[in-house]
Amino acid sequence: MVLVLVVGCQSGASPDRPDESGQSSPLNQAAGSIPNLPLKRLDGSAFASGSLNRDSATVLFLLSPECPLCLDYAYTFRTLAEEYQARGIRFVGLFPGTYFSELQIKKYCSRFRLEFPMVLDPDYALTRALGANTTPEALLLNEQGQLVYQGGIDNWAYEVGQKRLEPTEHYLRDALQAFENGQKPPLARTKPVGCLIE
């Protein structure tokens, strides 16, 4: 199963091209690299982040209920989840911080019919462990919690407030397809465009 984590956005922009900064994510590439943090799902049930180190591949979306691009990409989040969950990939939304209330997050999920699990990260502990800093941002983890892909969903938005009519590169979908075929993704990391997590 693949877990997609989306985090909310603030006011940052990233170029629409692979990350050439040379900086690596704090997430260790070794198996079992995600710390076991006691978090809570939006429905109130417990969520141990260490579960991401086993059982299934996961796509994590870092989300915010008022980030313009999280709103714009909501349909894409839903269609990807519907398609790939049926093939054994797990999807999870991650909401860092306490800026937005649980009611605001529930309204966002209900409005766009996002039915995969939503996890709250009030202290940014998992967000920092993942090296995520933008919403929306996507991470693809294999069954051992190893990072396969991190960055933007596609190249539809190439700057904050600037979008193409249609995306010409589909970073996350390409990574998912490569993963299913036992291959490395065409790009392992891209710079997400969106809002900085505060």
Residue ranges and their predicted role:
Residues 5-8:
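C-terminal motif of bacterial Sec signal peptides marking the signal peptidase cleavage site
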Residues 50-71, 176:
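Short active-site neighborhood of thiol/selenol oxidoreductases, capturing the structured segment around
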Residues 10-12:
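Bacterial signal peptide processing site
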